[in-house]
Curated annotation (Swiss-Prot):
UniProt feature, compositional bias: Basic and acidic residues: 468-479
Superkingdom: Eukaryota
GO molecular function annotation: ATP binding; cyclin-dependent protein kinase activating kinase activity; cyclin-dependent protein serine/threonine kinase activity; protein serine kinase activity; RNA polymerase II CTD heptapeptide repeat kinase activity
Catalysed transformations (reactions): L-seryl-[protein] + ATP = O-phospho-L-seryl-[protein] + ADP + H(+); L-threonyl-[protein] + ATP = O-phospho-L-threonyl-[protein] + ADP + H(+); [DNA-directed RNA polymerase] + ATP = phospho-[DNA-directed RNA polymerase] + ADP + H(+)
Modified sites of kind Phosphothreonine: 291
GO CC list: nucleus
Pfam family, one: Pkinase
Enzyme class: transferase
Record-annotated Protein kinase domain positions: 24-419
Protein name: Cyclin-dependent kinase F-1
Entry annotated with the keyword Transferase: yes
Family note: Belongs to the protein kinase superfamily. CMGC Ser/Thr protein kinase family. CDC2/CDKX subfamily.
InterPro entries hit by this protein: CDK, Kinase-like_dom_sf, Prot_kinase_dom, Ser/Thr_kinase_AS
Length: 479
């Protein structure tokens, strides 16, 4: 069990919160991480099952609440039902709707059932639900920054919802890069980087719904924006530290590679874990630029791997491509064992990152620090997606491309002709939903054994290595 630091409450402190326990019965721990503990709970007023998320970092908790409210109401984004702000000795507690499964459980169940992979009609419905959730977030100006199968939760009746928005940010204005290519712009704060305080958008872009059935059924009673802002006003009035957005450390625009040493990479105990999370992602971003150390390595966009701190929703679109490719292959498409190995795997498939394939890439912070020999014959996405139709490969190609400005949006993909081809997507009620896992089941152990390489060192996998000192530090060339 992880001990929290942000609010000082630590693990199991939720049991000493009468404001929480008077309204919710705590049934047991459902999961634990470095920055949050999640408990199964029951609302005392009506017996509705809930998830009680005790977040140990106050800023992260409030940003997650802001992002959930901005994206609401959406059938494919998890509902925030209640929020209990923390204090000097307590952590924030977010009350969310209870969803017992995630998309990784669907992938594992399908992999275990090989060679009978999920029918295309089933796979299309899962894909559409993922796209609906991401489109809802993006239309609200939210960039998730940690999309992966484990963060796409599923109800027992098959409704998939985007969840775990603890690393999310809300952009100043919705949409993608506009005007000059972002990596050719000056180093100032761009108009689409995150605000320190989230804006609750009153009008959202409408996307066509692909849910086959009318959305009947009782929606969970959500926390309203007015209620949430009232709670935040009360909290700020009590705070002795001023603006709550200044409670964490500054990121200092440092990239992952710039803030770790060779020893950090060699001793990484999470390198093979399916649920590897970049703990550096909790660093504060007061300077206006984002941190590049966000998300889970296997789903991290190339610009993040090269240290970009100036990006938008396009990083989610790369993650989306990796997720959909995993639905096709039933295994990760780029299972890197380290950041450098991750880049190497991507390059082996798509070829080298150059100004032709990614305009402005030479301006990325770490682009001139790490070099790879030219890949004469990239494997190509077609080879990574065997036995897939041209339409299926096309969807992945529209997402897994180096240039962020050329990645297809989730809203665009909802209208891709692939979903109108036979076989048509099954209705949600026709999905084959895996059985709920036991609360003590650790699904990450199975995936922790999946390793793309057997090397103990990040550098051993690339053969010879040439380190050159430069006026800015050093550069590394692998062969």
């Amino acid at each position: 069990m992880a001990i929290g630091g942000g609010g000082g409450g630590g693990s199991w402190s939720i049991h000493g919160r009468p404001d929480v326990t008077s309204r919710y019965e705590v049934l047991g721990r459902a999961g634990s991480g470095a920055y949050a503990d999640v408990y199964r709970g029951r609302r005392r007023s009506d017996g509705a099952p809930v998830a009680l998320k005790e977040v140990h970092d106050a800023v992260s908790a409030r940003r997650e609440a802001d992002a959930l409210l901005a994206a609401a109401p959406s059938r494919h984004v998890v509902a925030l039902l209640d929020h209990f702000p923390g204090g000097d000795h307590d952590d924030d507690v977010l009350v969310l709707e209870w969803l017992p499964l995630d998309l990784s459980a669907v992938v594992r169940a399908a992999a275990a059932a090989r060679p009978s992979a999920p029918p295309a009609a089933q796979r299309k419905r899962w894909m559409l639900q993922v796209l609906e959730g991401v489109a809802a977030c993006h239309s609200a100006g939210v960039v998730h920054r940690d999309l992966k199968p484990a963060n796409l939760l599923i109800s027992e009746d098959g409704v998939l919802k985007v969840a775990d928005l603890g690393q999310a940010r809300i952009l100043q204005e919705t949409g993608t890069y506009q005007g000059m290519h972002p990596y050719e712009q000056s180093s100032g704060v761009e108009p689409w980087v995150s605000q320190q305080r989230a804006v609750l958008h009153g009008v959202k872009e409408n996307h066509p719904s692909h849910d086959s059935e009318t959305q009947t059924g009782q929606e969970p009673e959500r926390l309203t924006a007015a209620d949430y802002l009232h709670e935040m006003d009360q909290l700020r009035a009590k705070s002795t530290h001023g603006d709550v957005d200044k409670m964490s450390l500054q990121d200092g625009n440092a990239s992952c590679l710039a803030t770790c040493s060779t020893a950090d990479i060699d001793d990484d105990p999470f390198r093979a874990s399916y649920s590897y999370d970049a703990e550096e992602g909790m660093l504060e971003e007061e300077s206006g630029a984002f941190t590049s150390c966000v998300g889970t390595r296997w789903f991290r966009a190339p610009e993040l791997l090269y240290g970009s701190t100036n990006y938008g929703q396009e990083v989610d679109l790369w993650s989306l491509g990796c997720i959909l490719a995993e639905l096709f292959n039933l295994e990760p498409i780029f299972p890197g064992t380290s950041d450098i190995d991750q880049i190497g795997r991507i390059i082996s498939v798509l070829g080298n990152i150059t100004e032709e394939t990614f305009p402005g890439c030479s301006n990325l912070p770490d682009y001139n620090k790490i070099f790879f020999n030219k890949v004469e014959k990239p494997i190509g996405l077609e080879a990574c997606l065997p036995d897939r139709s041209a339409s299926e490969v096309s969807i992945i190609k529209r997402l897994l491309c180096y240039d962020p400005t050329k990645r297809a949006s989730a809203a665009d993909l909802l209208n891709d002709p692939y979903f109108a081809e036979e076989p048509l997507p099954v209705p949600i009620e026709g999905l084959q939903v895996p059985e709920s896992k036991d609360e003590d089941d650790d699904s990450t152990e199975e995936w922790a054994n999946f390793r793309g390489g057997d090397s103990d060192s990040d550098f051993d996998e690339f053969g010879s290595m040439d380190v050159t000192k430069t006026d800015k530090g050093f550069s590394i060339r692998f062969s």
